[in-house]
Design a protein with these regions (language model features):
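Conserved class I S-adenosyl-L-methionine
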Residues: 146-191
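Glycine-rich, histidine-containing beta strand-loop boundary motifs that form or position
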Residues: 80, 102, 122, 151-153
């Protein structure tokens, strides 16, 4: 199995639950669209030849960016705090250049200043302390290397999204009943949301 450096149940357990059920949803190889490919290269600042470069991906989820990085020729080390790392391992072709583990962004069991690129997309805002997570990642970038991160836009309009209104309630629910509830309410809500966006 994969090396694990964190408890099986942790603050990111709901992400593991989600990505193990919908393991291929965001993979370009599954959708046939270059969504993850384009987002990754835009974040890096343009497509680059990563052959031989050491890349650390933090918060890999089910592997949407891992798939792109693995195809780039880089030596990729990737981890997630949740059990989503199991979905990622299942989604990737075995390669001597791909290394996966379950670990903590605040306590990464790797040598500092040893990666050409450290990449963390769509993750920092989900940690208990985004600023500390950012500082932790920066320690693993080689001198002259690149730290690639992003975070959600923080503004008043974003706070009015239903997910933020409902989060205080859903946070207290067990993940299995919450998932079943979502399966029931989503089919009628999707057409209603599309209608309201016109």
């Amino acid at each position: 199995g994969l090396p694990r450096f964190v408890p099986a149940t942790n603050y990111a357990a709901s992400f593991g639950f989600q990505w193990n059920i919908h393991a291929r949803t965001q993979l370009d190889s599954h959708s046939g669209l270059p969504i993850s490919h384009d987002r990754l290269w835009a974040a890096i600042g343009g497509k680059a030849d990563l052959t031989g470069q050491r890349v650390l991906e933090a918060g890999s989820g089910a592997g949407r960016f891992t798939e792109v990085l693995a195809a780039s020729g880089a030596d990729v080390t990737t981890f997630d705090y949740s059990s989503a790392v199991d979905a990622n391992a299942a989604n990737q072709a075995p390669s001597p250049r791909l290394h996966l583990f379950q670990g903590d962004i605040f306590n990464i069991p790797l040598a500092e200043a040893s990666f050409d690129k450290v990449i963390c997309l769509g993750v920092l805002q989900h940690t208990p302390d985004p600023e500390a997570a950012f500082r932790s990642l920066a320690k693993y970038v080689k001198p002259g290397g690149q730290l690639v991160v992003d975070a959600y836009t923080r503004n008043f309009a974003a706070l009015l999204q239903w997910k933020y209104v409902l989060r205080p309630i859903t946070r207290r629910m067990r993940k299995e009943p919450l998932y079943r509830l979502i399966e029931v309410v989503t089919p009628p809500l999707v057409p209603a949301a599309k209608f309201l966006r016109r």
